[in-house]
Amino acid sequence: MTKPSIFRYEGHNYLVPFLIISSLFFMWGFAHGILEVLNPHFQESFHISKVMSALTQAAVYGAYFLMALPAGWIIRKWGYRRGVITGLVLFGIGALMFIPGSRINSFYFFVLLLFVIGCGLTCLETSANPYTTVLGHPDKAESRINLSQSLNGIGWIVGPLVGGQLLFSGINIAIPYALVGIFVLAVALVLSRIKLPDPRRAHEADTNEKVEEKPVRVMAFGFGMLTLFLYVAAQTGVNSFFINYAEESIHIEKQTASLYLAFGGMGLFFIGRLAGGVIMNYVQPRLVLLACAILTFVATLIVVVCSGTLSLIAFFALYLGESIMFPTIFSLALRDAGTKTKLASSLLIMTIVGGAVAPVIMGYIADTTGSMAIAFLIPLVCYGVIGGYALSKRHVPL
């Protein structure tokens, strides 16, 4: 039997649109990556606590919760391309507003701008994530989304690298955001003038069942939503306080820690996503997810109880394990949505609000206990649930 092609389906070749959409993954990876450097930067610049600085994450990830359903409505009414363009425009406007923001120099104004950027990122992710899953054979959906997310991983590397070297060197915060804003709006202009396919028939060809008629699938989708919520909570919490942890427990400077985050943590994150897209051609996605959940659980436990070089190595292992989690959980959960893919995508994107919750809780724990390490018990619990979700898929044919 011929193996299904990753980019061909029903006589159509979706390679070119796949490459175009995948390039967008870098943009929001960069936006999230530089956000993690903003956290300690704002702590120093505005002399605020860890829990207060976590409002930066709360603004961006809170936007995912508020904007996901409107973004889904835009996609259902006008298609994926309009959803992407809307996201790029909001992203670009929010980034360019950092120019007057640097003159106003108010923490809360920056939080507002990050909320606008978060709304743009929501539209981008709500459009692009499900779009990659239908640009080819359904059986290769997990491989495609992991390959796309590999570019997202590069953005996560470049973000803290650029942000850390500029912000901790005293460079005006408006400079990196202004450059990103100009680039993003230019991409929006280009996309507004080209035509992209909308393979809605691919969704309809997969199944004629309605998700409401399958209570078991509704429960499975709900578990997928919870798992994605906890993953984003864990990832954001880890990213937000890596630099603080490195300074306190590993005794390295913030600028050096940002390099470790960019090249070590995010470098392995990128490699893991790239390798994951290939491995899932041969190994069931749920098994890869289970292995990564075990790795992240053990690594986080080491981060909590140890310090020094061992905990730094554990952090690197943690980033490697995290790499395939978001796209794999997203794609597995989307399988339980039947024909309701666009609505399901909006609901899944809403779960990214988990990123607004964990940093605040972890910041509060760190401020009250005086230990950043203890706060990492929060992502530890999250990784345990992710392992349970992977096990729950063992009876589901993949």
Give the location of each predicted region.
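Intracellular juxtamembrane helix-capping segments at the cytosolic ends
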Residues: 123-137, 323-338
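Helix-loop-helix hairpin linking two adjacent transmembrane segments in secondary transporters
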Residues: 104, 144, 148-199
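Extracytoplasmic gate region of multi-pass secondary transporters
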Residues: 35-39, 216-263, 267
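C-terminal ends and interior cores of transmembrane alpha-helices
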Residues: 89-104, 294-307
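Hydrophobic core of transmembrane alpha-helices in multi-pass small-molecule transporters
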Residues: 107-124, 310-325
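Central cavity-lining transmembrane alpha-helices of secondary-active solute carriers
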Residues: 58-73, 263-275
